[in-house]
Every structure is written in C-alpha cells, then in structure tokens.
A protein has these predicted regions:
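Metal-coordinating catalytic core of metallo-dependent amide/deamination hydrolases
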Residues: 111-126, 132, 140-253
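Conserved beta-strand scaffold positions in the cores of enzyme catalytic domains, especially
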Residues: 5, 58-62, 401
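Active-site-adjacent C-terminal substructures of enzyme catalytic domains
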Residues: 242, 252-369, 381-387, 393, ...
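Non-catalytic positions within long, well-ordered alpha-helices that form the structural scaffold/packing
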Residues: 135, 199, 207-208, 237, ...
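N-terminal metal-binding scaffold of metallo-dependent hydrolase/deaminase domains
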Residues: 1-54, 386
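Short peripheral tails and domain-boundary helices/loops at the edges of structured domains
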Residues: 397-408
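Divalent metal-coordination and catalytic microenvironments
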Residues: 9, 37, 42, 65, ...
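Metal-associated gating/positioning segment near the N- to mid-region
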Residues: 63-126
Length: 408
C-alpha cells in the first residue's frame, strides 16, 4: 500500500459533502488549523489536527504551515483543438465582435478546419501540454469537450483523444460530446440536416464509443435556436448523455430557461442571464458554471453570480479554455475574477472551483473536497490563508500539487 502523509498544514480549507452547495451553503467552508492528511493508495484515509500519527512506510510531505485546499476542478474546457487564433486579436482590438469574427469565417469554423486537419497524435500532444500547465496551476480534474470536429468522424476522433489523455495523463478527465457547437460551413444552407446528423448519426456512434458522459449545445443567436437545442439535448438523453447547455453568453434567447425545463446538470456562461432564467435553473436544480475569464477576454459584462447565489442556484466556475474567446487555462485567474468581478466571497469561490465544479461533472462523490474516501487531490499553496490566493492576482501560488496521492 502506497501512503502519503501531508503534515504541518497551517490551514486546511475545504467544503464538505458529495453534492453541490447552494445559497448560504455555498459559503460554508471547513477550516482546520495545524492539520494533517493521510492518503493511502490514492484515496484520503484520514484527516485530523494536532499530533501527527506515526504511519509506517509513508512518504511525508511538510506543508510548512501553508494553506491546503482540494485540487481545483475545471468543469468547462474546449481542450481538443488544432491551431490557435491569435490572428483574431487585431480584429477584436478594432471593434469586431465575437459574432462578427464567426460570421466572417473565423471563430469556431476556423478552429474546426485546423482540427479536422490534425491527427489524433497531434491533438493529444497539444492537449497534454495544456494539461501539464493546468496541473501546475493547481487543477487536478478537467472536463473536456469535443466540438471542433463538427463531422461524425472528427467528433469521434476528439473523444478518442480525451480517452487517451485520461488513460495516460495524470489529470483525470471527463468527456462531453458537443457536436452542436456550430453549424459547419458545408451545412449553412441546410441547418436542419446538420441537426438531424447530430441527433441521428453522431449520437448513436457516440453512445457506442462509450467515452462521453454529457451532451452540450451552444444555444445562442446565429448558432442553435432554443428548439434546436432542445432537440439535441433530448436526443442526448435518449442515448444516455446528461445535458449541458451553453446559454445566455451573448444574447438571452431562452437557453437558461431551457436548462431548467430539461433538467440540465449545468448551464454554462450565463453572462446575460435574465431573472426568469435564474428562476428556471433554481427550480430545475441546474448548476451555473460561470466562466469569468471569457467575460474578461471578450470585454463583456460579468454574469450575475450574486443573484444566482441568492436565488439558490449552485455556482461553479471554470476556465472555458479554448483558442478563441478564452485562451486561459489558469484556474487561479478564475479565482481572482470570482472575487473581484462577481463579488463572491473567498469561501464561495473555493466551493465554486472545487465541490460545485465536481458536481457539475457528476464527480462530487469522488473529488472536490478533502474528506475520507475521496481522491487524494490536494494543493499546497504558497499562502497563509484563503484570502491571500484570492487577492494575489497574476502569480502562480501553487507550491505543491498532489494528484491521487502522488506529488506532481
């Protein structure tokens, strides 16, 4: 049995439980001073304070009085893609909007072209490098979407890459099928046929492949309507894929209301989410997966996070790592923005990037808190307390990252 003992933890900060926290519960964090954590064969065996137990054969890590939290959970990424889109920066600086760039042949379609041309090996190598960087910032679990293939062969290829990464990289990954990311150029004059392709051809093969756990759709002006999104998500449910939905990122066309109606596990973005959307999500038990770094990169407003907390909607936060609207893979920056722009407390933010993020990908029983029986995923921070990592913008404060009981 492999054992790792983390001792001399100045302050251990963790949410507790195996489900998402909402309302006042979102800000409830357990703090333990002078703590220790014992991990056996990758699983947390015990957590305590005071005298450190003598554990025969254990590797000992001295936290040197620093802060320790659960490993961070990045519950929304577009990890698998070819190329980059730095050429769009100048267009943005001259006033082009996200939809302007997309409608001119850039945006998602540009990345789709590059992704289709890339081999599985090329996509895996690129994504593996990104995962290394993510882990260096304290992320230990990642959701990864397909969605830059937009053809059956290439969507399945992206999901195979995610499986390969999950099998061979230290990071734990969960796959989401997102064939409904955009109507590709070859179907612009026949979008109904593309929706049919996603629902009737891609979905059965995704189920047969057995990699994806979720189905996502981009419900937005100039992408997929509410009814098209409903059609996609209902087809996903038919094939055993739990629904997620990109909603209210640019225009509020009803995506957040659909999330509540269909019982989505999470709704993403929600930058311009209206009160009726918040109410629908609260009623439907939907987790709001907010992406503040995307607002930052787009120069957009920030999602009404406080209104969601007040309404009893569980709030998670993630990077939205992608080559266009958010080439950011640093969850520490997400933490900073959660406090500075959403005005969430450090405690609410910690829950958002750990337990609620885990719940948004149906892993709250395995990760997201430092508790007996969960995976031994920890971050030792170069910080004395939780406030410090929220207020120190622009520095990597992850001193030591531990994944399944092993030092990364």
């Amino acid at each position: 049995m492999k054992k790792l003992l983390v001792k001399n933890i100045g302050l251990l900060a963790t949410p507790e439980g195996k489900s998402a926290h909402r309302g006042e519960e979102q800000g409830k964090i357990k703090f333990l001073k002078n703590a220790w954590v014992l991990i056996e064969d990758g699983i947390i065996a015990s957590v305590g304070t005071g005298a450190v137990p003598a554990v025969e054969g254990a590797e000992v890590v001295d936290a040197e009085g620093h802060l320790v939290t659960p490993g961070l959970v990045d519950a929304h990424t577009h990890l698998i893609f070819g190329g980059w889109r730095q050429n769009e920066l100048g267009l943005k600086l001259h006033g082009a909007s996200y939809l302007d760039i997309q409608n001119a042949g850039g945006g998602i379609q540009s990345t789709t072209n590059a992704t289709r041309q890339a081999s599985e090996q090329e996509l895996a190598a690129k994504a593996s490098k990104a995962l290394d960087e993510m882990m260096g910032f304290g992320t230990t679990t990642v959701e990864a979407k397909s969605g830059y293939g937009l053809a059956t062969e290439h969507e399945l290829k992206a999901l195979e890459v995610i499986k390969d990464l999950n099998d061979h990289h230290r990071m734990d990954l969960v796959a989401t099928f997102m064939g409904a990311h955009l109507v590709p150029a070859e179907y612009k004059s026949n979008r109904e046929e593309y929706v049919r392709l996603v629902c009737e051809e891609m979905m059965p093969k995704v189920k047969e492949q057995g990699i994806a756990k979720f189905c996502d759709v981009f419900c937005e002006a100039d992408t997929f309507t509410v009814e098209e999104s409903r059609q996609v998500l209902e087809a996903g449910l038919k094939y055993g894929l739990r629904p997620k939905i990109h909603a209210d990122e640019i225009e509020a066309i009803g995506g957040s209301q659909l999330a509540g109606e269909i019982g989505a596990i999470s709704a993403e973005h929600l930058i311009v989410c209206p009160p009726e959307g918040i109410a629908s999500m609260a009623k439907g038990g939907v987790i709001a997966c907010l992406l503040p770094a995307t607002s930052f990169n787009l120069g957009a407003v920030f999602a009404p996070a406080r209104d969601m907390v007040k309404a009893g909607v569980p709030v998670a936060m993630a990077t939205d790592f992608n080559p266009g609207s958010c080439p950011c893979l640093n969850m520490q920056f997400v933490i900073n923005l959660g406090c500075l722009e959403y005005k969430l407390t450090p405690e609410e933010v910690l829950t958002a990037v750990t337990l609620n993020g885990a719940a948004a990908i149906d892993l709250a029983d395995k990760v997201g808190s430092v508790e007996e029986g969960k995976l031994g995923d920890l971050v030792i921070w170069d910080a004395p307390d939780l406030d410090y990592i929220c207020y120190r913008v622009g520095s990597n404060l992850a001193k030591t990252v531990i994944k399944r009981g092993e030092i990364v």
